[in-house]
Each structure stands twice: as C-alpha cells, then as structure tokens.
C-alpha cells in the first residue's frame, strides 16, 4: 500500500522541476514532459521510489539505527527541525560543519562542551565566575547550540541520512559517501542521481513539497521506532544488560535452586502415585462393601415374606 497518493503529490507541487536551462541530463529518465519551459517530473516513478525509501528508513530505525535529517536552505529549515524532533532523530538545519561525519571524534568533544555549558547558571555570579566570563560562556553556548543543537544526542555516526537539495548539501553527501552512509534525498531536475542511494524525484524548492516528503520520512522513522519497542515483547526477551558481580551471584543461586526444585516435586509425585495405585489394587482385591446383585436381593425379600406368613398371630 502506497504511503502517499499522487493527488497529494500534485497538491504540494512535487512534480514541478527546474527550467530547461537548468537541468542534469542524468535526470532525463525521471522527467515526464516539459510545459512552458519547465520540466515536469514523473510522479509514478516518484511514488514507487517513495515506498522504497520508506521501507528502508523503517527497517533501519527498527534495527536500532538513526537517521540524520539535513536541510539548510530556508525552505527546509523549519520542517527538518520539526519532523526530526517529532521522532527523536538528529538534524542539521543550519550551516553544515565540515568534518561533522568524517571527524566525528572532534565534533563529539564539542557536543560534550555544549552539555557542560547547559548546566551553567549564567545569572549566578557566586560560582567563582565574573560577569564577563559568564557572558563569554553564554555566547559560546549560543554558538554551539545554533550549529550543533540538533545533534546534541548523537553518540556515533548516523546509519543513514535524509537530505533536502542534494546539490546544495554536497559537502554532507561527500562525507556520507566516504563513510559508506546511505543517503535518501529529494532529486530535482538539476541534481545528480548517482550521488544518492535512495532517490526521490521531486521539487526541492517548494515549502509544501519539502514538508510533505520530510514528513513521510519521519513517519517511516516513527513506524520503525514502534517496531523496535515491540520486538522484545514479541520475542519474550529484552536486550541483555551488564550485571554487577553480586547480581550475577544471586542470579546463579536462583537458577541452581530452580534446577533442584523440579526433581523433588517429581519424587513426591511418584511416591503419591505409587500409594494411590497400591490402595486401588487392595480395594479391587477385597472390597469392604461390595454391592449385592439383583438376584440375591430378590431372594432375601422372598425369605422375609415367607417367615412373616409362618409367624403365629397373637390374640
């Protein structure tokens, strides 16, 4: 079942490409026709590729992966931040920092610095800092928040990357290709489809088009998160966590006690069943109150009647 309809794509203007003077010949296979000097994108192909990208994102997140949302152009900044925050995924909607992926160790140090500054009370001058020092720290925090705030919870390189306007975000795509990170992206008629593993032909300039496609990717991530949390319940086992030594000893003692318990119960059950069998055999061999047959009962009744007739009647 398609996650979006062609009518929705048409209403959001996903089918509008760039003018004929600004196009990449490699995108020719995704172009349906040309109207008034503007290329029209084939939405049938877009629909199929959206479903493919949706399934990939869902499976990636379901298996514990993360999707980095990237879109620094004005048309994409708001929807990138909104949808990424909705599903708890990292995002970059300001300037892309060179080396964010290829030099992630250094970036991670700056993220730790940002978390340290978040704990500072800039209005409290009794902690040993002067007002000037607090002002400098506040400016540093604001600068880090603007550039790294969207990836503050990113502990390792992402599993995949969603990109709006692959031509503008060429630095991010180059770093992802060096690290072998799959890229899902909107391909307008001026983009290179060879740079993206999961292309979605569409309009990357219209706000409604960008918002719709970004929401679809976020919905796929949300569905993957639901599957991830349902897996331990379905399989009946939660992911193992490291135990302390004393916890491990208690667990081993409990396992040993459980291993001995069924043996004792089996012995008791065997003894009880043996007694019941012996008792039933004795009752069958020598019944205490065996029921009388119908013939014996009739003979007894006739004898009592005869005796009563022979007995003398008292005057």
From Swiss-Prot:
InterPro entries according to UniProt: Ribosomal_uS2, Ribosomal_uS2_bac/mit/plastid, Ribosomal_uS2_CS, Ribosomal_uS2_flav_dom_sf
Chain intervals for the UniProt region annotation (Disordered): 250-315
Pfam families, sorted: Ribosomal_S2
Gene3D superfamilies per record: Glucose-6-phosphate isomerase like protein, domain 1, Helix hairpin bin
GO biological process: one example: translation
GO CC, alphabetical: cytosolic small ribosomal subunit
Keywords: Ribonucleoprotein, Ribosomal protein
Comp. bias intervals (Basic and acidic residues): 272-282, 297-315
Single annotated GO MF: structural constituent of ribosome
PANTHER family: 30S RIBOSOMAL PROTEIN S2 PROKARYOTIC AND ORGANELLAR, SMALL RIBOSOMAL SUBUNIT PROTEIN US2M
HAMAP family (alphabetical): Ribosomal_uS2_B
Protein family: Belongs to the universal ribosomal protein uS2 family.
Name of this protein: Small ribosomal subunit protein uS2
Source organism: Clavibacter michiganensis subsp. michiganensis (strain NCPPB 382)
Lineage: Bacteria, Bacillati, Actinomycetota, Actinomycetes, Micrococcales
GN (gene name): rpsB
